């Protein structure tokens, strides 16, 4: 009978079995040869004696050879308790060598000797490692759990086109030239398609789909990524948020056996920026940001005086019971400067005595720092300060906060802190373009309070948007959609899109609004980011089977690559060298 290597058990004793797998280790011991044979499901020991006809073939095997063997299952004289199959071994009678393997360029074990470039160039070998196989087994279970729950709630799974038109989603599009001298764009999201499915009467739609964004890459980004896309008719924010909470509760229970507590916390965008300096706060630890302007009204420190004179903010993180050192603060200061801060000031206190810091020289201000610590009930600890505009100080300390938590080991991997970020601005100001742009996308419905003035008073306009954040990562975002053609046209005009341009780009959607549109809302959940968190990885490429590196390059395929002149000519394209 054919059996997987990892499934050999008591029921197979004294029976002939057929196994297939990869050779992991060959050990010749006198008149015996032992081979560790592995498949996806586990590893088992096989052996032959010198008198067996297969002895020589087994001794000549190499690591990663792919073989088929037939033999008798026996109890091992010296069991290996570290293996699930460690009580058994197979006495081989027949062997078929499917394929011989060269010496691999990396050690195919959980702990490998290869750097990332080698691992990704030979990704098919890297994926043989158990640590990677387990990631993709879990990923498969996550897919199944999402589908099972949404099917149970009467959702229709529907594919939408990959070859589409450009959309104003905030990142650059990938374009696909055609032989007709026209271009498709790969979708940054199925946004307009899923809204049209609501017009079509689907009411409950989802798909697990690929999306594409030609943007700067980070550890949690890939140019192509997978999202669970959901849209729901005759529903509002509360209904879809409740749906997503129940969905994630089911997925976590089914995949990693974790019971999530619902409902999730809700926090306004303004509160997130005020307290955490980020619209995706990590709530596994405290370290809230405080505004301390009133403490420094009589400060003798020049840059504090200047900040208050210019109506700027003095913001701080208080670190209880920990005395940071100069090296740690210098590391954190680099992150503050990355967000535009001029520097990161600090003071450390122990048993109510100032012991270290960058602000020691001005003795008159020591009473200020002692008062701050006293008011926050701290006799020992550190304080990190940034004096700048409110936005710069908040963003700088937000990034400092995240990296401080890493230094202090506060990011516990098995704690899952969800939060809904709500009450979003409808627009954000693009300093480079010198104008307001849609904060999420231009299909978001303004709040009732700002509906009449959203396109005039853009700074105060609010949208019916919501992001779901998990452990400092934006897991997903969504909104209640505009369903009125006139409101949609106002929104387009407010982001400098003329009626002519709107008709050219979105005429199909505007026309659909003339034929009866149900109120609807939706969300897209980043499946890759969810997988990052589930397996406690810092890099999205660890949970993608064939990822791109930080430069957007597929090391295995050497893609993107140049096109030959003949193909360019057929498409009517010419590459212009800078």
UniProtKB/Swiss-Prot annotation:
Give the EC class as a word.
ligase
Provide GO CC annotations from the record. Answer: cytoplasm
Q: Which InterPro entries does this one have?
A: Aa-tRNA-synt_II (IPR004364), aa-tRNA-synth_II (IPR006195), aa-tRNA-synth_II/BPL/LPL (IPR045864), Asp-tRNA-ligase_1 (IPR004524), Asp-tRNA-ligase_1_N (IPR047089), Asp/Asn-tRNA-synth_IIb (IPR002312), AspRS_core (IPR047090), GAD-like_sf (IPR004115)
Example GO biological process: aspartyl-tRNA aminoacylation
The family database entries (Pfam families) matched by this protein are listed as:
GAD, tRNA-synt_2, tRNA_anti-codon
Q: How does it assemble?
A: Homodimer.
> What is this protein called in UniProt?
Aspartate--tRNA ligase
């Amino acid at each position: 009978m054919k059996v997987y290597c990892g499934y050999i058990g008591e029921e197979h004793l004294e029976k002939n079995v057929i196994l297939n797998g990869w050779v992991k280790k060959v050990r010749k011991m006198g008149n015996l040869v032992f081979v560790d044979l592995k498949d996806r499901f586990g590893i088992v020991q096989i052996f032959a004696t010198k008198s067996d006809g297969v002895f020589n073939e087994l001794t000549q095997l190499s690591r990663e050879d792919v073989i088929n063997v037939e033999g008798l299952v026996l109890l091992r004289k010296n069991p290996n308790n570290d293996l699930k199959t460690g009580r058994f071994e197979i006495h081989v009678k027949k062997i078929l060598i499917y394929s011989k393997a060269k010496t691999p360029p990396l050690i195919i074990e959980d702990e490998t000797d290869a750097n990332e470039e080698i691992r990704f160039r030979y990704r098919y070998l890297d994926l043989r490692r158990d640590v990677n196989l387990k990631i993709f087994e879990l990923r498969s279970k996550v897919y199944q759990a999402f589908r099972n729950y949404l099917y149970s709630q009467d959702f229709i799974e529907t594919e939408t086109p990959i070859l589409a038109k450009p959309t104003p989603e905030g990142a650059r599009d990938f374009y696909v030239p055609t032989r007709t001298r026209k271009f498709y764009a790969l979708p940054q999201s199925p946004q307009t398609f899923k809204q049209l499915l609501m017009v079509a009467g689907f009411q409950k739609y989802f798909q697990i789909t690929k999306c594409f964004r030609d943007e700067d890459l980070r550890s949690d980004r890939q140019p192509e990524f997978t999202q669970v896309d959901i849209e729901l008719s005759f529903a509002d924010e509360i209904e879809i948020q409740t749906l997503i909470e129940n969905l994630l509760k089911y997925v976590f229970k089914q995949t990693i056996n974790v019971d999530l507590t619902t409902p999730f916390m809700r926090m306004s965008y303004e509160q997130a920026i005020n307290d955490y300096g980020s619209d995706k706060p990590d709530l596994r630890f405290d370290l809230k940001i405080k505004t301390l302007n009133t403490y420094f009204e009589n400060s003798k420190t020049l840059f504090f005086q200047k900040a208050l004179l210019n109506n700027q903010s003095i913001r701080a993180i208080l670190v209880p019971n920990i005395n940071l050192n100069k090296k740690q603060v210098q590391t954190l200061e680099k992150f503050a400067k990355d967000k535009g801060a001029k520097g990161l000031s600090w003071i450390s206190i122990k048993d109510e005595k100032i012991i270290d810091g960058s602000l020691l020289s001005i003795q008159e201000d020591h009473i200020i720092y002692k008062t701050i610590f006293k008011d926050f009930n701290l006799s020992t600890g550190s304080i990190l300060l940034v004096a700048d505009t409110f936005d710069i100080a908040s963003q700088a300390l937000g990034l400092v906060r995240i990296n401080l938590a890493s230094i202090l080991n506060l990011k516990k991997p098995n704690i899952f802190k969800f939060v809904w970020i709500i009450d979003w601005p409808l627009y954000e100001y693009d300093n480079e373009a010198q104008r307001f742009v849609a904060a999420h996308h231009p299909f978001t419905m303004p709040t009732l309070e700002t509906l009449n003035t959203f396109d005039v008073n853009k700074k105060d306009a609010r949208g019916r948007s919501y992001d779901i954040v998990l452990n400092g990562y934006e897991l997903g975002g969504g909104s209640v959609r505009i369903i009125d053609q006139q409101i949609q046209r106002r929104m387009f005009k407010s982001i400098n899109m003329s009626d002519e341009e709107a008709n050219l780009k979105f005429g199909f959607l505007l026309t659909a609004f003339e034929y009866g549109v149900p109120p609807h809302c939706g969300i897209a959940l980043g499946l890759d980011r969810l997988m990052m968190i589930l397996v406690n990885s810092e890099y999205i490429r660890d949970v993608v089977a064939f990822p791109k590196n930080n430069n957007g390059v597929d090391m295995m395929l050497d893609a993107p690559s140049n096109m030959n002149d003949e193909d360019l000519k057929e498409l009517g394209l010419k590459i212009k060298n800078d």
